[in-house]
Design a protein with these regions (language model features):
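A glycine-rich, coil/turn loop motif that links secondary-structure elements
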Residues: 112-120
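Structural motif corresponding to the C-terminal cap of alpha-helices
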Residues: 81, 102-105, 203-206
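A small/polar active-site loop signature that marks catalytic segments
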Residues: 79-99, 222
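Short pre-catalytic segments that frame enzyme active sites
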Residues: 1-20, 26-68, 76, 92-113, ...
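Short, solvent-exposed loop/turn segments at secondary-structure boundaries
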Residues: 40, 85, 255-258
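A penicillin-recognizing enzyme superfamily signal
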Residues: 1-8, 20, 72, 76, ...
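Predominant activation on well-ordered alpha-helical scaffold segments within soluble catalytic domains
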Residues: 25-26, 83, 95, 126-129, ...
Length: 264
């Protein structure tokens, strides 16, 4: 803090790259896709408008696998599959979905957003990942959970959740208490379950397999931007979500072989 008061977690706007892809795939699952749906992984050239060059997105390593499952596309972080999914979903759906999750405020409606071209913060992106492990509900980050006095009495609690029938002495032949919450349901619990399973595959077989030997049930996604300028890894267990970003304050390449899978 003595060197810089700038908070790179909450203030630095950077492109998330492939770390944004899980939200494209989650939206696809909300729109009648399944993890086994086949999507073409092949070259693609798109018009960007008059007086603009044709856009030709590429896969990392410039390899193509042909028709591939949605699960494999996320595990292997296939750019061309992701763009095709985005074309099918439509940009308005993608932009609205990202805004509901708090990732972006008003991003440009460009297909490149599906590959993480719009800028966000590490805090916003990590918070959005929490929705996967919370059944599709958006949980906003807080700094203070609760405050207790010297005798252990809670004098402040951030969450004011109502628990109906929690004061019952016995639960025999009675309804089990339910704790309500005020979290917004962004997508279905079924989608959250499927995406979590697919992101577990990223750790087991995909770009995050360097974490495979950690003795934890973990899911997550790597991210790398053009010229290896920004590298990311956002991961989570059932109890904790962690976001890692590596990059310079003044954007420049970290090196030819520096990726989210390696550096972050």
């Amino acid at each position: 803090f003595k060197k810089s008061e700038f908070n790179r977690v909450s203030q630095a706007l950077r492109q998330p790259g492939s770390a944004f892809k899980p939200f494209i795939y989650a939206l696809a699952l909300e729109n009648n896709y399944s993890p086994s749906t086949l999507v073409l992984d092949a070259p693609l050239v798109l018009e960007q408008g008059s007086d603009l060059k044709m856009w030709q997105p590429e896969n990392y390593g410039k390899k193509f696998y042909g028709p591939s499952t949605l699960r494999m596309g996320l595990e292997k972080s296939r750019n061309l599959m992701t763009v095709r999914i985005a074309q099918d979903l439509g940009l308005k759906k993608i932009v609205n979905f990202s805004k509901k999750l708090g990732i972006y405020d008003n991003p440009n409606e460009l297909l490149s957003i599906s590959l993480g071209s719009a800028e966000t913060t590490l805090l916003k992106l990590t918070s959005a990942y929490c929705s996967f492990v919370n059944g599709g509900k958006l949980v906003k980050p807080i700094l203070i959970d609760r405050i207790q006095d010297s005798e252990g009495n809670t004098i402040f609690n951030t969450e004011k959740r109502e628990c109906k029938k929690c004061n019952q002495i016995s639960f025999l032949n009675k309804e089990v208490p339910k704790i309500s919450d005020n979290f917004n349901q962004i997508f279905t619990p079924e989608t959250a379950y499927q995406i979590t399973s697919m992101l577990e595959g990223v750790i087991q077989r995909g770009t995050g397999r360097k974490l495979k030997n950690i003795n934890l049930d973990m899911a997550g996604k790597t991210g790398t931007t053009n010229k290896n300028t920004d590298t990311w890894f956002i991961g989570f267990t059932s109890k904790l979500a962690i976001g890692v970003y590596v990059g310079f304050d003044n954007p420049k390449s970290l090196g030819k072989y520096e990726t989210g899978a390696k550096t972050a």
